[in-house]
């Protein structure tokens, strides 16, 4: 229950009414109710007109006077600045009420005409005002979101710039290492070519020595035949001659043996140097493989960076489309500042999208260059591996030939018949040191099967589609 105080005041019209102007204060009955405020409510004025045949009864129990019949009462509810609700009851006669109603109708008709001329339909204006208020609230919220997002994007772009600088320095270091590797590979190629030439020269020398050995064996056989034929005629002369010939032959054999031992040592040194060069080439190939793996990892990092940049670019494009759609809508004169802010934000977004496109294009160029360098290095490494395998095959072939010559010499010395003349046959061999079998099997082909050209094609196709 609300506690209220009420007062009733009755007025009677005393003045004469002029024609054409209704009297507003005749037979007025005021009822004032003061109600304590429940909640702060905006000031509103509502007018209720009720037609009553009987006098009203107050709810607070006070005695009221009998009001005259045929009077229309109006109740007005208002609130004063002191946050108190008041109710005032006014009373009019029927003629006054009709005049008031006609006057109100005329005023409403004129106001409706003026409103239609100025603003058009009132309902449409209310809807437009509501829509504009909603758009303003949404635009303020979007502006706050865009400001925060733009700050985050600015920090992200700064981090991207720092990463781009680090990647540029890394690419410069990689280019330097690539130049060093290419120089080392060319030096190794020259060394292998020189080794191949020395191998060919040593093979020629070995063939010449083999021919000399065959000629010496033929001379030895001729001498034996002569000795056998001349033993019966003159044994002593033949012995002297055979001694002289044997001494000469022995000197020649010793000299040939010394030369052969020297050449054998030279060949052993050359083979050792070949093996060392092959080991160094294997080590360099392993280092090149490690550098290729590092480059693959860096290419993967660049790919991930490019994907993040493309996602960022897509988000910025979506924001730009939202700004453009918002700018393309109808805006009132009060939204010019908002329109200018949207234009500035869209221009900054376009600039950032252009900057991201340039960065993505630059990173794609770097990835393509690194991929081409990796492919060229792979081809060079494969060529070096083929050369090393060919050299190892030649070494094994030389070892087989040497073993075959040694076995032939052993066979000839064993099957040669002994004569009465005491002679010594010295077998001259040119055996090379057997190379360890593990060295020839240590060379393995590179296990990399990653070809980043497919990734470059995917990136280029994505860029053309966007």
Curated annotation (Swiss-Prot):
Membrane topology: Peripheral membrane protein
Region (Disordered): 1-68
Subcellular location(s) of the protein: Cytoplasm, Cytoskeleton; Cell membrane; Cytoplasm, Myofibril, Sarcomere, I band; Cytoplasm, Myofibril, Sarcomere, Z line
Tree of life domain: Eukaryota
Tissue expression per record: Detected in heart myocardium and lung.
One example of a Gene Ontology biological process annotation: intracellular signal transduction
Coiled coil regions in record: 95-137, 187-415
UniProt GO cellular component terms: anchoring junction; cytoplasmic side of plasma membrane; cytoskeleton; I band; Z disc
Ranges annotated as biased composition (Polar residues): 1-10
Signal peptide annotation: 1-16
Keywords, sorted A to Z: Cell junction, Cell membrane, Coiled coil, Cytoplasm, Cytoskeleton, Membrane, Signal
Compositionally biased intervals (Basic and acidic residues): 45-55
PANTHER family (UniProt xref): GDOWN1 (PTHR23171), MYOCARDIAL ZONULA ADHERENS PROTEIN (PTHR23171:SF2)
Complex and partners: Interacts with DSP, MPRIP and TJP1/ZO1. Interaction with MPRIP inhibits the activation of transcription factor SRF. Interacts with GRIN1. Interacts with DYNLL1.
Protein role: Plays a role in cellular signaling via Rho-related GTP-binding proteins and activation of transcription factor SRF. Targets TJP1 to cell junctions. In cortical neurons, may play a role in glutaminergic signal transduction through interaction with the NMDA receptor subunit GRIN1.
Family, as annotated: Belongs to the MYZAP family.
Identification of the protein by name: Myocardial zonula adherens protein
């Amino acid at each position: 229950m609300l506690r209220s105080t009420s007062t009733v005041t009755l007025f009677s019209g005393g003045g004469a009414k002029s024609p054409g102007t209704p009297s507003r204060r005749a037979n007025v009955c005021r009822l004032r109710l003061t109600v304590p405020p429940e909640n702060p409510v905006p000031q509103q004025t509502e007018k209720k007109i009720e037609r009553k045949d009987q006098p009203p009864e107050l709810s607070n129990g006070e005695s009221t006077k009998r009001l005259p019949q045929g009077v229309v009462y109006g109740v007005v509810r208002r609130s004063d600045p002191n946050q108190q609700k008041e109710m005032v009851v006014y009373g009019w006669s029927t003629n006054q009420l009709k005049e008031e109603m006609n006057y109100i109708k005329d005023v409403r008709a004129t106001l409706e005409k003026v409103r239609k001329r100025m603003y058009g339909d009132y309902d449409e204006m209310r809807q437009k005002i509501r829509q504009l208020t909603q758009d303003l609230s949404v635009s303020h919220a979007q502006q706050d979101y865009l400001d925060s997002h733009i700050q985050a994007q600015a920090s992200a772009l700064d981090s991207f710039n720092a990463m781009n600088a680090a990647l540029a320095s890394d690419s410069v270091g990689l280019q330097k290492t690539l130049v060093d590797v290419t120089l080392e590979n060319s030096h190794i190629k020259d060394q292998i070519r020189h080794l191949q030439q020395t191998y060919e020269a040593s093979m020629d020398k070995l063939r010449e020595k083999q021919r000399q050995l065959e000629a010496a064996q033929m001379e030895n056989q001729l001498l034996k035949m002569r000795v056998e034929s001349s033993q019966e005629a003159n044994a002593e002369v033949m012995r002297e001659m055979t001694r002289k010939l044997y001494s000469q032959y022995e000197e020649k054999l010793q000299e040939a043996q010394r030369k052969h031992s020297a050449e054998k040592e030279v060949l052993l040194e050359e083979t050792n140097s070949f093996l060392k060069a092959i080991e160094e080439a294997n080590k360099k190939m392993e280092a090149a493989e490690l550098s290729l793996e590092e480059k693959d990892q860096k290419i993967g990092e660049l790919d991930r960076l490019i994907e993040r940049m493309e996602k960022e670019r897509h988000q910025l494009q979506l924001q730009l489309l939202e700004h453009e759609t918002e700018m393309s809508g109808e805006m009132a004169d009060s939204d010019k500042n908002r329109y200018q802010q949207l234009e500035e934000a869209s221009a900054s977004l376009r600039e950032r999208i252009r900057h991201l496109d340039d960065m993505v294009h630059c990173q794609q160029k770097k990835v393509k260059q690194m991929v081409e360098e990796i492919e060229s290095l792979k081809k060079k490494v494969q060529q070096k591996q083929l050369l090393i395998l060919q050299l190892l095959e030649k070494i094994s072939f030389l070892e087989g030939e040497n073993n075959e010559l040694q076995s032939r010499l052993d066979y000839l010395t064993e099957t040669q018949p002994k004569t009465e003349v005491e002679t010594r046959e010295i077998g001259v061999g040119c055996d090379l040191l057997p190379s360890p079998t593990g060295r020839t099997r240590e060379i393995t082909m590179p296990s990399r099967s990653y070809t980043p050209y497919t990734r470059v094609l995917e990136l280029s196709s994505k860029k053309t589609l966007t």
